[in-house]
Amino acid sequence: MTTQPLLIAIAPGIALALIIYLTDWHEREPLRLLLKLFAIGFIAVIPTAIIEQGLLMLNPFTGILSIAFIAFLIAGFTEELVKRHLVIRYALNRVEFDERLDGIIYSVFIALGFATAENINYVVFAFASNPYVGIYRGLISVPAHMLFAITMGYYISLSKFSIDTGLKRAYLRKALVMPFLFHGIFDFILMAQMDIVLLAFIPFTIYLWVTNLKKLNSYYRDSKNNHRQH
């Protein structure tokens, strides 16, 4: 194994994690905690892949229905369920989680750890002979994991800081449902290989970026205002 494919595989996740880390400049989270969350997401790829392989063997469909099953249930639902579980298990109740922006930061670091491990598998091993896979995944797939995580973290924070028990539960459900739907639609568009479906890719990708940057900016402003008051 040469070093170059490995560097290509890990660079996007690390670069995006650094950008998100620098976004939180009013009260940065402990680097040790963020590295731990990144590592947890990285390791979680192994059990997730085992679950996905099991579900793949249970796929009863063929053709376009099979693609939808893989995109939404096997990839979208399974991966986002695992990532949400990790955020709840390892970040939700930490004392450092003291403002809304933190929910996005924690979710993104777990997701980028996950995406980096997944990227190593694709770029270094599964498609090592194709030099374009690393570029494609670095520009499309890894950033997509970050965007799904911004949505997840947005609702995780709404849940944490809500005083209403019903709303807490509703936002936790949304922290799974919305990323799962985004992930499923994203993968389905790419996997379907149908011209009419592929036409939706650019508009949907723009929508993902715009809506999630709005979420990130709203919590950034919230963080900024909180620290002005102190």
Question: Residue spans of the language-model regions?
Answer:
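Hydrophobic alpha-helical segments at protein termini of multi-pass membrane proteins
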Residues: 1-230
